[in-house]
């Protein structure tokens, strides 16, 4: 196996072309964009909304559009979008993310069913609180906001999770690998939560 890194702005047509030139006929597509910044929706102008929708909804759709027909022709394809548990459990300060990612979720729900007969699956992974650099930044902001130590802020965040811990990045990778496998061929159009039980609903 060889890995070909491509440094580009994937939200642009030129960036997408660079990626597809490096791998023109992928059997597996994983879309993963960093979340838009938190804040108050009153402070965001139209450009902020367009940027969020472009990165977290339109770019994945463009990449799916460029690759799904080849998957259909080869009768195998796996598409996974890494979004957020906020799709099912919206976070008040992440309205940009809530809106853009929910739009992608709705799009996938329809498309997944239209290509399922060709052994092409489309699913979304919805990670909760994972022990990543981004989470460290979030914990630091929480500590500053509450006037507590980093350790106290981290403990408060973990206490809200029934599993009483943050997720490990490898756990997300394992779940993604399974969705991309032949063994997951009967799973499509789904939103798989990896949140340690944080979401309180039944479906």
Model-derived features: positions:
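Substrate-binding pocket helix/loop in short-chain dehydrogenase/reductase
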Residues: 40-42, 48-53, 79, 157-158
């Amino acid at each position: 196996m060889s890995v070909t890194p491509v440094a580009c702005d994937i939200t642009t047509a030129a960036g997408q072309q660079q990626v597809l030139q490096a791998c023109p006929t992928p059997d597996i597509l994983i879309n993963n964009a960093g979340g838009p910044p938190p804040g108050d929706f009153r402070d965001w102008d139209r450009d902020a909304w367009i940027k969020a929708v472009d990165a977290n909804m339109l770019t994945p759709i463009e990449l799916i559009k460029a690759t799904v027909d080849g998957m259909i022709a080869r009768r195998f394809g796996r598409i996974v979008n890494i979004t957020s548990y906020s799709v099912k459990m919206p976070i008040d300060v992440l309205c940009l993310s809530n809106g853009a990612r929910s739009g992608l979720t709705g799009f996938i729900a329809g498309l997944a069913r239209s290509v399922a007969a060709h052994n092409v699956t489309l699913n979304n992974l919805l990670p909760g609180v994972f022990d990543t650099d981004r989470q460290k930044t979030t914990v630091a902001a929480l500590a500053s906001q509450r006037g507590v130590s980093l350790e106290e802020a981290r403990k408060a965040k973990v206490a809200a999770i029934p599993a009483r811990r943050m997720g490990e990045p490898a756990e997300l990778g394992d779940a993604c690998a399974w969705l991309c496998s032949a063994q997951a061929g009967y799973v499509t159009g789904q939103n798989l939560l990896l949140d340690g039980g944080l979401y309180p609903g039944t479906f």
